[in-house]
Amino acid sequence: MDLSAASHRIPLSDGNSIPIIGLGTYSEPKSTPKGACATSVKVAIDTGYRHIDGAYIYQNEHEVGEAIREKIAEGKVRREDIFYCGKLWATNHVPEMVRPTLERTLRVLQLDYVDLYIIEVPMAFKPGDEIYPRDENGKWLYHKSNLCATWEAMEACKDAGLVKSLGVSNFNRRQLELILNKPGLKHKPVSNQVECHPYFTQPKLLKFCQQHDIVITAYSPLGTSRNPIWVNVSSPPLLKDALLNSLGKRYNKTAAQIVLRFNIQRGVVVIPKSFNLERIKENFQIFDFSLTEEEMKDIEALNKNVRFVELLMWRDHPEYPFHDEY
């Protein structure tokens, strides 16, 4: 696989392609300064990123859209050069809500289509505008999932030209098989966005996805920010790992660059999230070196099956994906 800063798209099973590195745009709406996301996306595009990963529930898609449109207006990129991934949240799984939800994202972005639209989690929550619905006692309000019905509504969005490719996120093997074996399947999921890094290499899920032509996109590819609401903070920080740092010295790279290179060398798309402008540039400098087979094996051996993003608050949901081995 010949990847370079100028040319690093890999094929998807539907004939489209995806840039192997993207900018993640997740942010805490309350603590992120206005405009930080737009600035980050503009710097990323100037740096060479062509893949932006976002979601309506990040509450910053308007900034992402503004940045993309500004770079198109400047003549820096064309719309077809940019790959935008949007997400269908858990409160919008009801089939008749899928298209209006995507159309709302398109209105916010002020774009005609998204390149990839994915079901963000396999768990359905009570439909409505409340992103995290709970009752008066703080108990989560779930909704019965029907992933196949939701998928059919996604397929209709692709047929209508609102999205080029369809995928999923946080799906385990059983949930992927539900879609793959669906009678009358029109469009296969092209990707599954999951946590993936040297402490959580996902060998079995990766193999299953490769057998079915499903690309793995790695969120939290550098470990993760250590927010105790979401993250198992007892887990060791990935970027302090001795092996990753010694490889960094060998190649005159940071541990983060080694980690990103490791995943792209195995065909895993990475979407490191950063609003730090220097780090955005640094994360992209991974095309001017490659790891040896031996080094790849050494990094693979770091796997501890440590999942940072456990989503434990939803572990009693019938479709909670992480009870299964993979």
Curated annotation (Swiss-Prot):
Changing residue 106 to F: In CBAS2; decreases protein level; accumulates in inclusion bodies; acks of 5-beta-reductase activity. GO terms for cellular component: cytosol. Changing residue 58 to A: Loss of activity. Optimum pH is 6. Highly expressed in liver. Expressed in testis and weakly in colon. Signal peptide: none annotated. Keywords: Bile acid catabolism, Cytoplasm, Disease variant, Intrahepatic cholestasis, Lipid degradation, Lipid metabolism, NADP, Oxidoreductase, Steroid metabolism. Belongs to the aldo/keto reductase family. Catalyzes the stereospecific NADPH-dependent reduction of the C4-C5 double bond of bile acid intermediates and steroid hormones carrying a delta(4)-3-one structure to yield an A/B cis-ring junction. This cis-configuration is crucial for bile acid biosynthesis and plays important roles in steroid metabolism. Capable of reducing a broad range of delta-(4)-3-ketosteroids from C18 (such as, 17beta-hydroxyestr-4-en-3-one) to C27 (such as, 7alpha-hydroxycholest-4-en-3-one). This is Aldo-keto reductase family 1 member D1. It comes from Homo sapiens.
